[in-house]
Amino acid sequence: MHKQNKTCKIQQCVLKYIHTILGVVIMQGAIFDVDGTILDSMTAWVDITNEFFTEHGINISKEETLSYQSMSFEESLIGIHNAYLPNMAIPEMFDEFSRRASEKYSKNLPAKPYVCEYIRTLYNDGVKIAAATSGFPELVYSAFKRLKIYDMFSVYAFSGEVGCSKSSPDIYLLAAKRLGLKPEDCTVYEDIVTGIKSAKSAGFKTVAVEDATNTQDKDRLIQYSDRYITGWDELLSNI
């Protein structure tokens, strides 16, 4: 096994040298959003949010429900608390949302088709991989372990650590720092416009991922990203 790993590293070094001579840019780091990018979960979160509002007697439009997806979870809870439930403690809201989501993430929430294969291919090619997400750490970890991709991620970065939403590139910069890489050496994979724009502004290459909840933003995702994909098989076919 040790000999195989050594041989693989030598092959990777030779390949990188050849690419450098030819002027080919090699991706050293891949930074993935989780919900809506790796996990087919955005519709589930819309359902969870709608169920929460219904049980508390709150009427809310689809557009407003979707607006929360660009926020960190902490920002979403504060917004809901201030606008609709000032008498409900935020920790209580946190526990309720977490309880609703926990079973889905740990048992049956699916990954998007071919994304695990793509991540595995990058991992085998020696690319450093990070997750940058607004989600709960426990939910992300449980889903990734179930999907057998947890150990392929070198680092994890959460919006709660940087204290702001993805309209700021801080979470992507944190992920790159933990990978030991510069932004220009990393590609960010995202499904929301604010994330694509902020990552691009910080010097990252960007790939926008189509999702059932972002079709209204397709034109802007195409405009601001380096590439737009409708499915992960598109990237697998290029490897």
Which role does the model predict for each range below?
Residues 17-28, 120-123, 137, 141-239:
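Asp-based, Mg2+/Mn2+-dependent phosphohydrolase catalytic module
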Residues 68-72, 110-114, 135, 167, ...:
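Short beta->alpha linker loops
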Residues 28-125, 150:
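N-terminal helical cap/lid subdomain that shapes the substrate entry/recognition surface
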Residues 38, 111, 129-132, 164, ...:
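Conserved SAM-binding loop
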Residues 2-5, 17-19:
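Intrinsic-disorder-associated, low-complexity terminal segments enriched in Asp/Asn/His/Tyr and depleted
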Residues 59, 128, 205:
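Residue-level detector of anion-binding/catalytic polar loops
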Residues 37, 133-135, 210:
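Conserved phosphate-coupling serine/threonine residues in phosphotransfer and NTP-handling enzymes
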